Regions:
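Conserved C-terminal portion of the radical SAM core fold
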Residues: 167-227, 245-268
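N-terminal [4Fe-4S]-dependent radical SAM core
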Residues: 1-85, 324
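Short amphipathic alpha-helices and their capping/turn segments at secondary-structure boundaries
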Residues: 71-75, 126-140, 171, 200-210, ...
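Auxiliary Fe-S-binding modules of radical SAM enzymes
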Residues: 2-14, 18-23, 213, 221-324
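Short, electropositive alpha-helical surface patch
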Residues: 102-107, 135, 195-212, 270-293
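Core AdoMet radical
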Residues: 51-71, 75-98, 113-126, 142-169, ...
Length: 324
């Protein structure tokens, strides 16, 4: 990556695969999670409320095809020639019997204008028979599997009730990428118990994995979640980046320690105002990106600037990660 480019952005990445504008359409295909249904735990992740990212057209009583058609109507007025990626986003989209999964994925691909799939899932929910199916599907359509990593610390993963370990992440990402499938990750910055240094060290750890893309966003406290209750009882356990500029500087430090080839899809997330407790910056996503780019220019920062330094500093322990 040229140092004239501050970071690898997702739209540029997509242009390598498509000669036209492409938009993801989020889907709720009616799945659950193993840490919700009792297989690995109850109640789900302590921070999770799926209402925060499900558009109005995402309703489980609607078929996958119906949700896609309604999503197309939502976007088509701006770009009539746009094509779409079916984004299986809500909950764990590989957590079902293989034949049922195949029906849903293939239903999505039959919708006019859909040119590929993005499948969001957990690192502990990629059985071998499904991976073999996806490997074959990948030969015929655009496909990305996006893993919810959230943290590289097992201690944090236990605290937020994820029900998997970082070793599960390493194995799943390596297995998926080895099949030639584009493999993405998602992490949250600001989870309770994590410091600036441990979060930045995490960037070096993720850079060791064969990830194609990475989504980053700030911890958001959402009404009705267990984490919101924990915050009410012990607010000192949380550092919520009340000022957006503090979070921007953390993101820059993080990005400087990432592998220079990794594609960065997102830096921030916006939850509905009626659900959000904190942080409430009042900054739209595009405004955040503008401020981030300005600050990176001021600091002379770019993705991977300190990547090799990260490799030397990261120590991975069984229950947590630290820096030298």
């Amino acid at each position: 990556m040229s140092h004239q480019i501050q970071y690898n952005d997702f739209p540029t990445f997509l242009r390598k695969y498509f000669p036209y504008k492409v938009q993801k359409i989020s889907l709720n295909a009616g799945f659950t999670c193993p840490n919700r249904d009792g297989t690995k735990g109850w109640g789900g992740c302590t921070y999770c409320n799926n209402q925060t990212f499900n558009p109005d057209y995402c309703r489980t009583e609607k078929s996958v095809a119906t949700q896609l058609e309604e999503g197309k109507c939502f976007f088509a007025h701006k770009y009539p020639e746009m094509k779409y990626l079916a984004y299986f986003q809500a909950y764990t989209n590989t957590y079902a019997e293989l034949e049922g999964l195949k029906r849903k994925y293939e239903e999505a691909l039959q919708v006019d204008g859909v040119v590929g799939l993005v499948i969001g899932t957990r690192p502990d929910c990629m059985p071998e028979d499904l991976l073999r199916y996806l490997e074959e599907l990948n030969k015929h359509t655009f496909l990305m599997v996006e893993y919810g990593i959230e943290s590289a610390s097992d201690e944090t993963l236990r605290r937020i009730n994820r029900g998997h370990t970082y070793a599960d992440t390493v194995e799943a990402v390596q297995r998926t990428a080895a099949c030639g499938i584009l493999t993405g990750g998602h992490i949250i910055l600001g989870l309770p118990g994590e410091t600036h240094d441990t979060m930045v060290a995490q960037a070096g750890m993720l850079s060791e994995l064969p990830l194609s893309t990475l989504k980053i966003h700030q911890l958001q406290l959402i009404r009705g979640t267990r984490m919101a209750h924990e915050y009410e009882e012990n607010p000192a356990d949380f550092h919520l980046f009340k000022e957006v500029d503090e979070y921007i500087d953390l993101v820059i430090d993080y990005v400087e320690h990432l592998h220079p080839d990794l594609v960065l899809e997102r830096f921030v997330s916006q939850s509905p105002k009626e659900l959000l407790i904190a942080p409430d910056w009042g900054v739209k996503n595009y405004e955040f990106v503008t401020r981030l780019q300005k600050r990176m220019k001021e600091r002379g920062a770019y993705q991977g600037k300190k990547y090799r330094d990260s490799e030397k500093r990261v120590i991975f322990a069984e229950d947590n990660f630290t820096t030298e």
